[in-house]
A protein has these predicted regions:
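Short secondary-structure boundary micro-motifs
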Residues: 39-42, 60-62, 79-80, 90-91, ...
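Charge-rich, low-complexity linker and terminal segments
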Residues: 1-26, 50, 86-91, 95-182
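Mature extracytoplasmic or otherwise solvent-exposed domains
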Residues: 45, 59, 71-73, 82-88, ...
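A positional/architectural concept
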Residues: 1-75
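The −1 position to Zn-ligating cysteines in a subset of zinc-ribbon hairpins
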Residues: 77-80, 137
Length: 182
């Protein structure tokens, strides 16, 4: 452990002692982490907000499987009208925690608990919308002046027809061949 790294996700331990006693037993859980300073350039999680998972852990032979829905509050600017917009992104998760985790695939199971902090942190980052809209049909600040369907300014500069002719479909067929003469 290097420890103390800036931006390290907070720990959020979930005890799995009870369910580990009987294969297949389940337990409802609602772990959460409080985040500060999480966000992308245009969208972020408001400081102090909680990322909450509502789900359950189930005992399996390799360890435990965690399933549920992660709720991620966010705020940003509408990409069309630039008004402030807020929302809650919801992401389904299904993750396996085991004593011998596979790098990049499963998470560590430590004795009698799992740490879901890193999962909540990573899931929240991926859940943030890249281009938020205040509403699906937001028309922008002045729809008459800036229609969302762009008309090219270059339409009247045409100097003859220089568009490529349609490609002979026989050439396309040849693209897939390996022209190895042996
Ligand atoms: Zn808008």
């Amino acid at each position: 452990m290097t420890g103390g790294a800036e931006g390290h996700p907070p720990r959020e331990l979930v005890s799995v002692t009870e369910i580990r006693r009987h294969l297949g037993s389940r337990l409802a859980v609602t772990p959460s982490i409080e985040v500060v300073g999480m966000g992308l350039s245009d969208v972020r999680v408001p400081d102090g907000s909680e990322i909450v998972l509502t789900g359950e852990v189930e005992s399996i032979s390799e360890g435990v499987v965690l399933t549920g829905t992660v709720a991620v509050p966010w705020t940003g600017a509408c990409r069309r009208c630039l008004n402030d917009v807020t929302g809650v992104a919801e992401v389904e998760v299904r993750e396996i925690y085991e004593t011998d985790p596979v790098e990049g695939e499963t998470w560590p199971l430590e004795q009698d608990h799992i740490d879901v902090g890193p999962l909540l942190h990573d899931t929240a980052l991926l859940a943030l919308p890249l281009a938020p809209l205040c509403s699906d049909d937001c028309a922008g600040p002045a729809p008459g002046l800036y229609p969302t369907t762009v008309v090219s300014d270059d339409a009247d500069l045409g100097e003859g027809d220089d568009a490529e002719p349609p490609r002979d479909p026989r050439w396309a067929a040849l693209d897939g061949l390996d022209l190895d003469e042996g």
